[in-house]
Amino acid sequence: MRSGKRIISVLAAVVLMMLPAGCDFMRITEDLSDCATLFSVKYNVTLRTNLTTQVQTVLRSRFENEVADLLEDSLKNIFREYAHDVDLSFYPGEERSFHDSHIMDAGQATYSLELPVNDYRHLALANLADEVEVDLTQSQWVQRSYLSQIVGDTIQGHNTGLFTARQDMNILGNVDQEFDVTLYMVNCASILVIRTDSVGYSQGVAYRDCQVYSSDFADGFMVNDSTFTHRTNPTVHDFRVTNPPVKREIYYAVTFPSCDTPEEAQTLPDTRADNSQTGSTEEDRIWRKYVYVTLPNGDVTRTIINVKMPLQAGQVMIIYAYMRPDGSIYSPNVEVSTSVSLKWKDGLDIETGE
C-alpha cells in the first residue's frame, strides 16, 4: 500500500428478510483524497406494517378469503422488504460531495468505495427508479433533499414502496468502522372493499360505473428531517383491482401518510371543487374517500367517506362497505362516517371509466 493512502471500502448490505440473499460489488474511485480510512455500512430495509393484521381482521374474519388473497397479491410488490434500487448521498456540509445510484434487485448487496475522511450526513433511499408519481428533488443539498409528488389536481397513487434513512457518520482515520443504517417505508395504502349485495339485495345492486378517489394526504417528504409536507392537497384516483369476486369491488390508493389529527387536517387546502356544493364535511375526519356510482339511468350518487383515524407510514387501512340500490355507500366501521349526495351534479366532471 502506498504511503499516505489507504483503501476505503464501504459495505452496503441490504438485508431483506423475506428474500434470498445475493451480493453485488462495485468500486467507486471518483473524488478520492489522500486521507482515507476503512469503514462499512450495513443497510437494513425494514417494513413495519399492519397489512396482514388488517386483512385478517377485516376480510378473513368475514370469510372474504378470495378478496383477501387478491388484495395481498395486488400489494405484494409494494409492501415488502425489498430494494430494487438504492440512492446514496454523503454530505460533509450542506452540499453533497458524493452520490451513487445502483440497481440492486437482490436480498443483499455489498459495495466497495473510497471516500475522504470527514464527518458526513448520509441519506439513503430505495425504490425510486420505477416510481412514476414521486421524484427526488434538490438532493444536492442535505436540507433540501425532498421526495416530491407530481403536481396535479388529480393524480395516480404510488406504484412502489418507498424507503428512506438518514444517519450521521464520523469517518475517522486509521480506524476500522461499521455503521448500521435502517431504511423505513414512507408511504402507505388506503383500501376500500365494496359489497354490492347488501342485506335484502342478494342479486346485487345494478350500476353502470364506480370510481373512487382519495384526498387529505401529504404531498412530499423532507428526507433529512424525516417530515411530511402538506403544501397542496391533490386528489388521488384509486386503482381498481381487476377481476374481483362476484358482487365485490376493490379499490386502493398508495400515498404518503395523512395528518395525525383532525385539527391538522382541517388546515389543508380543499382542492375538490365539488365540496363547495355541500359545505364542510365532518370536523373530526382526518382523510376522505370519494365514491361516485353511476346508476343505469345515468344518475350519479356521490358518497364521501370521512375517516377519523390517521394513516401512518407503512400502514394500511381497509374500509369494508356496502352499496345500496340508490348507489350510496355505507360502512359498519365505527371509525368512518359517510355523507351522501343523490343525483349529484349535472355534467359530471370525473373519469367515468367508459
Language model features with spans:
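Sec-dependent bacterial lipoprotein signal peptides
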Residues: 1-24
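Bacterial Sec-dependent N-terminal signal peptides
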Residues: 18-54, 346, 352
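Short coil/turn motif common to extracellular beta-sandwich-like domains
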Residues: 33-46, 69-74, 185-189
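Beta-strand secondary-structure signal
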Residues: 40-44, 87, 121-123, 178-180, ...
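Structural motif
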Residues: 45-80, 193-203
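Tryptophan-paired
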Residues: 71-136, 203-315, 349-354
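Structured interaction patches on ligand/partner-binding surfaces of diverse proteins
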Residues: 105-107, 129-178, 298-329
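Compositionally biased low-complexity segments at domain edges in trafficked proteins
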Residues: 151-202, 322-354
